């Protein structure tokens, strides 16, 4: 699971941090991944619909392509979320992906897996996910740098997102822990490879 070379991610992060912002400033909830059923992006959209009215400055940004794209766009439209759920399509450029992560507030994985947890943590993001295959356990500590929600439960997911949106200081504290964990992991790697 120790996916993208963490050191090169940190180097990339330094470039991203010094670049001018790409996006309008918002409380951005981010998901990156192929739009396939088992990623449960539909669940994320449902959860966002529940809290969206209370956070006019928030946006759900979905990066990725896949067979579920049309269904998900239709779902967002039906829920009255046009303009609040933004489908970006696939982005393959690591720098641009980094900019999106840097300019987001929370990273959410609603379904199965994604190597993107490491990357999101590099950009000091709190992570919300369900326990899927256990690899998350090494990275995300519930109530420390993210939350686990009850798998398949939109209310539980909405509650976790809302809790962070409502507590910006905590969101920042969680994000700081994420980055620290990644930096420590790098140091461990460096130590163990000597």
Regions found by a protein language model. Give the residues of each.
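Acidic anion/phosphate-binding donor-loop and adjacent secondary structure
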Residues: 1-26
């Amino acid at each position: 699971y120790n996916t993208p070379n963490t050191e090169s991610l940190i180097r990339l992060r330094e470039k991203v941090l010094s670049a001018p912002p790409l996006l309008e400033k918002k409380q951005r909830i981010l998901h990156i991944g192929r739009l396939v059923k088992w990623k449960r992006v539909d669940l994320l959209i449902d959860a966002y619909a529940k809290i969206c009215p209370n956070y006019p400055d928030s946006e759900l940004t979905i990066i990725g392509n896949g067979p579920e794209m049309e269904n998900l766009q239709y779902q967002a439209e039906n829920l009255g979320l046009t303009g609040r759920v933004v489908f970006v399509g696939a982005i393959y450029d690591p720098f641009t992906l980094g900019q999106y992560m840097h300019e987001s507030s929370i990273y959410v994985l609603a379904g199965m897996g994604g190597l993107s947890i490491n990357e999101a943590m590099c950009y000091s993001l709190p992570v919300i996910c369900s326990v899927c295959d256990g690899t998350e356990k090494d990275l995300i500590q519930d109530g420390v740098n993210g939350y686990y929600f009850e798998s398949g439960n939109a209310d539980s997911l909405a509650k976790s997102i809302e809790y962070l949106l409502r507590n910006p200081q905590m969101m920042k504290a969680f994000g700081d822990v994420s980055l620290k964990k990644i930096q420590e992991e790098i140091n461990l790697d460096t130590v163990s490879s000597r």
